[in-house]
Structure formats: structure tokens, C-alpha cells
Amino acid sequence: MNKFFKNILIISLTFVLLLSILIIGILWNYSNNIPDYKFLKNYKPPVSSKVYSGDGELVADFSQEKRIFVPFNSIPKNVINAFLSAEDKNFFSHPGVDAKGVLRAFINNITNIITAKRLEGASTITQQVAKNFLLTNEISLNRKIKEAILAFRIERALSKERILELYLNQIYLGSGAYGVAAASLEYFDKSIRDLNYSEAALLAALPKAPSRYNPYRDIELAKFRRNL
């Protein structure tokens, strides 16, 4: 190996080493400044406060948020599959962050920027749990790094089923409804046990933009989003 290529190799290895040290330092710094996530293991979201008459008729609902907690084992498979299909197809195989999804979104967003189209996200369901429970909606690299670190840690601490349970009971689906059970009653006036796949798919279409795709606002747009 001549001297020129030897110098190039030394410079390249030095650059890679320094870059690795920088990245490790940044991640270490963020890792020591993220919220505590361990409470999620036993967390149950607040539910609606309702008053019923003697014959079982709903008299009053004192909560601003419509929410009904449903354990994972009581959530129908068609509802789970609809949300996985719409939000995170690789949920059961990734470790919290979907590298393939990030790469795909990066490539697609190059075209989207050129054509002035809406940018794609690449957040997994676990990342959404991290954001919804522990972070803000701030759009920044700072938040995305924390979100990714939290997602990896949450995946190590909780089962996939528990993460899905948290997500499906916490996600905002428009019209004041939080979680799939409350949204099922709000939009279809039925229990999630009675939802058909088309109805489940419509609910799964809402997380990206609950107001825009709200079926009360524009049923055709909601169906269009459902069918994507």
C-alpha cells in the first residue's frame, strides 16, 4: 500500500472513530435526560365519569375526554390488525424503531419535498406511545432522538401486547374520543366487539389527522383515507 492510500485510510478511520465517539456522546447525554417510562407497566388511563339512571340510561357524562379502558385480550383481532396495517406493519418484528420504515420515509420525502407534498412520518406504534405519554408534540430533532431512545427502552421493559394496549386505549381519534372503545361508541354507537373490518379500518385511518379525516366532517374523505 503506497503512502497516499495509507494516509487516506488513516484519515478515514480517524473520522469514523471521532464520529462514533460524537454519536455515543450525544446518545449518552440524551439517555440521561429522558422521562421515566417505568410507570407505563401498570398505568391505566383515566376513564369517563358517567352517571346512569336506575334503568341503565346514561344521564350525564362529566368528562371532557371520552375514554373507555379495554384490556388487550378484549380488543378484537380485526381492530388490532386494522391499526397495525395503517400505523405499523412491522410492529411485532422491530425493536421500537423501524429502520426500513425510516429509510423508506427518507427516500419518499425527497420526492415529496420536490413536489411540495405532505411529508411522511416513520414513527412506530412504540414511538407514538413514547410521544403521547412522555413527550410533547414539538417537531424537532431533539424530540425525535428522545422518542427513539424511549422506544428502544420501552420495548425492553414491556411486552408487545402491553404496548399495543397502551396505544389503543390512549390514541386520540377525534370528536373528544380517546382510545378505540370510546371512538367505536362515538362514531358507530356500538361496542368494539361488534365492529366489522370496514369500521375498524375507518378508526385506524384517524390517528394521522383526526380532525381532517373525522367522518362527521367529511365522510368521503374519511373513507378515502380508510381505503389507502
Language model segments and positions:
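N-terminal type II signal-anchor transmembrane helix
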Residues: M1-Y52, N90-F91
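Structural signature of transmembrane alpha-helix termini at the membrane-water interface
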Residues: I21-N32, L103-F106, I110-I114, F133, ...
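Non-catalytic, structured segments within soluble enzyme domains
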Residues: I23, A116-L228
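N-terminal post-signal-peptidase region of extra-cytosolic proteins
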Residues: I34-Y37, S63-F72, A86, A148
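Short extracytoplasmic
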Residues: N42-I68
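Short, glycine-/polar-rich solvent-exposed loops and beta-turns at beta-strand/coil boundaries
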Residues: N42-Y43, F62-S63, P95-K100, L141-K144
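Solvent-exposed loop/turn segments at secondary-structure junctions
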Residues: L58, R67, K89-F91, N109, ...
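Flexible, acidic/glycine-enriched loop-and-adjacent beta/alpha segments
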Residues: P71-I125, Y178-F188, L195-S198
